[in-house]
């Protein structure tokens, strides 16, 4: 009886792996279409949105969907469609969150969304977007972005503190110089 259940479990796992492999192959074909469209000199936004919907509806848990969301969010931002860009970054955050998520894409999406929210003067939302990273010992860029948001909120001392943390984290001279300029501009 135990043997029978083990054999059954093994068959389910094998079938599940075959289904996932087939789904990944299908997603790869859709991604090929995606690349062809987004690589055009003037990509058709409606086609991109239709392909993105297909990814989200049929292949949500694949890396192809994450790549498509990231490239569409960047495309929208470059086309001055900031709300669409923000929406796609938020979708990317949602599917890359959690234990089995993709931390790198999640961080990229959060930082990019935060920058967009800052430009829209939605300072509290911008801070919330990166709070996961700014409250921990993180890289210089997150501290600098946090400083930018706090400065816009008029929280001068907190902004300077974040800029100083950023300067200490940066290893390249140009980033350190930029942060130093931001601090000196505050003091003026």
Per-range role (PLM):
Residues 23-26, 44, 60-65, 84, ...:
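Structural signature of alpha-solenoid helical repeat junctions
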Residues 42-91:
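Extracytoplasmic/periplasmic/luminal assembly and interaction segments
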Residues 1-8, 12-13:
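Single conserved hydrophobic/aromatic residue that forms the stacking wall/gate
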Residues 125-188:
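Extracytoplasmic/periplasmic C-terminal soluble domains
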Residues 70-137, 141:
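Alpha-helical adaptor scaffolds
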